[in-house]
Each structure stands twice: as structure tokens, then as C-alpha cells.
Amino acid sequence: EIQQNSNTTYRIYDYGRVGADGKPRQLHIDKAVDVTNLCPAKPYPQSEPVDMGGWTKKRLAKCEYFTVDVINVDTSAALEADKSSFVNILVLDGGCVLSSEGNDAVELKKGDSVFIPAGLGKFELTGKCSAVMTHID
């Protein structure tokens, strides 16, 4: 799930769970309806993959809050997490090694997700994998 940061949670269904007091937890249906946007989303035009030299990038979605790309790494991808945003990578298929200067390398496989903090700087994915890459704008 990709969303704007918020410290508010409205519970609209709770699967019959109960709180520490043994009673059903409070639902927030009216508040959830008040903040729900029921307008259909505008479809984002699909782009063609862009060859980045050793990997490709295809834009899935972009809005004022975040950008989502699918990347396909054939050999290696040199990337960067600058001070303006974290980068999140979710491996869809294959496997790769995430490395950055001064940090231990991390092996990633299908289903793994890694949060790369803002300001980490340059990092590299090496291997052969497909992944969803998200950052805020």
C-alpha cells in the first residue's frame, strides 16, 4: 500500500476482534466515509520501458505525492536515495544484492521489501530481478 503519511486510522471493519477489555473495538464508519474520495482515479498513461544501461525502468504511476516505477535489472542498477526521499524496493521476481558504501550487502529475493532511508546516497542492485521502486516527490 502506498499512501500519504498519516497518524490517523479509521477502523471500518475489525473481523470480530476484541480489545484488551474483551469488548469489540470501536469502529469509525462515519469518519471514514467523510474522508473517502469516491471519485474514480484518472488512469495514468503507461510508459514504455526506458533502457538505463544494465536495467530498465517503466513508470507505473506518478502524482504530487509519490512516483512508482517497475525496474528490471539485467546486470546492475546504480541508484540513489537523496535527502529528499526514501526509496522502497519490492522484489517481484528473481533476486539481487543491494550494496552501498559503508554498509553490509543484503541479498534480496522474490517477495522481499527493503526501505532505503533518505540521504543514504548511492546504492546498487546487482543480479537479475524485477522490482517495484517507490519514492516520494
Model-found features: residue ranges?
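Ligand-binding loop in jelly-roll beta-barrel domains
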Residues: 1-8, 105, 118-137
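Short, glycine-/Ser/Thr-/acidic-enriched flexible segments
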Residues: 7, 65, 76, 86, ...
